């Protein structure tokens, strides 16, 4: 797949506004500041494709990017400490759940987790949802360039031990990644390619 061909299609506030439910979609999810926009820009080799914001939680829409042949990348709203009311946060969450449960063309989720921190409630929720809806999930442990070898091993172990608490994790994979140094980029593309086949 040539990810550098990605083009912005639209932003939708609601799942009902999304284009026809055909083809293949891969969704990117992550807490605010997990490095989601940077990862999308690195993957597509386009600096400004997804806006990298200094204000966490700027992504309030479901943003879609076309890869050609009815394949799409989907940028889900950044979740976390966005400066919005609880009711808006709940609205985002219900739209996200609606997307994950109702979108038939969704073939996988990329969950971005800051490798320097423990898994947060949102991360656990996304992993649990992926398992319960039998979805492919690839966890990107971002900002790995900021870790030494010992810390990288710890980050891998953290995910490993968390996944051991579930019975069915055969559709879940994970890796270290850095948008800055492009560490893990080839491995990440290979994983996505299998989902778009």
Curated annotation (Swiss-Prot):
CDD domains: YihA_EngB. GO terms for cellular component: cytosol. Belongs to the TRAFAC class TrmE-Era-EngA-EngB-Septin-like GTPase superfamily. EngB GTPase family. InterPro entries: G_ENGB_dom, GTP-bd, GTP-bd_ribosome_bio_YsxC, P-loop_NTPase. GO terms for molecular function: GTP binding; metal ion binding. Its cofactor is Mg(2+). Pfam families: MMR_HSR1. Keywords: Cell cycle, Cell division, GTP-binding, Magnesium, Metal-binding, Nucleotide-binding, Septation. GTP binds at residues 30-37, 57-61, 75-78, 142-145, 177-179. This is Probable GTP-binding protein EngB. One of its GO terms (biological process) is division septum assembly.
């Amino acid at each position: 797949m040539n990810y550098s061909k990605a083009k912005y299609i639209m932003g939708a506030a609601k799942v009902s506004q999304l284009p026809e439910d055909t083809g293949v979609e891969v969704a990117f999810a992550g807490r605010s500041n997990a490095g989601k926009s940077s990862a999308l820009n690195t993957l597509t080799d386009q600096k400004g494709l997804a806006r990298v914001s200094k204000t966490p939680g700027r992504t309030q829409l479901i943003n879609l990017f076309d890869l050609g042949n009815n394949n799409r990348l989907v940028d889900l709203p950044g979740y976390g400490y966005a400066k919005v009311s609880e009711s808006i946060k709940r609205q985002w969450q219900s739209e996200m759940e609606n997307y994950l449960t109702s979108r038939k063309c969704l073939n996988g989720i990329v969950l971005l987790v800051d490798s320097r921190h423990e898994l947060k409630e949102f991360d656990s929720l996304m992993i649990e949802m992926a398992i319960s809806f039998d979805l492919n999930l690839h966890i990107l442990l971002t900002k790995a360039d900021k870790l030494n070898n010992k810390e990288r091993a710890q980050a891998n172990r953290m995910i490993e031990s968390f996944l051991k608490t579930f019975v069915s994790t055969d559709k879940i994979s994970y890796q270290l990644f850095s948008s800055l140094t492009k560490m893990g980029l080839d491995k990440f593309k290979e994983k996505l390619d299998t989902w778009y086949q």
